[in-house]
Amino acid sequence: ELERMDAADSGFQDPPGRFHQPANLKQVVDDVRNRMAADEALFYDDRTIRCFLGGLAMSRLHLLQGISGTGKTSLPRAFAKALGGHADIVAVQAGWRDRQDLLGYYNAFDKKYHESSFVKALYAAQCPTWSDRLFIVVLDEMNLSYIEQFGADLLSELESPKKPNLPQLGLMDSRPPRRPTRLLEEGTAI
């Protein structure tokens, strides 16, 4: 799967000048809100978009909570698209109990690493297509399992004062994946 991503990414060309330099926060919020409405027919108020932007400025890890149907998953996806970025949605399962559920696992019998959706998203974020763009990974419905169990390694790295790194998985021609600087993790829960 990861080789397919590499092949699809070769020869990527950045689309010319869709974006301009905004003058102030109000203009950024207006631009994002208008793009989200035009691209996805999603309508968020200015306060919601300002809070989301403020959160992004403060931390790389966010938890969006609210009742079903309020747009917890749609917001990061539409926001990333409005800024020319991308959001990958990783569905958390009720049975997730350890790091293998989030990071995948190595099968010693077939001598193959079975990457998870989360690792595929991290890998995609490192591809040249997204080298200078926002990339958001959404762990959707995190309330279905305990993040302390399946995401302990990720939480530990994100809370560390040093630059976060991923556990050594040895992907990409024996090079371990790096966590891109413009990668943001979002979680949703009710």
Model-derived features with residue positions:
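AAA+ P-loop NTPase catalytic core and its hallmark functional loops
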Residues: 1-190
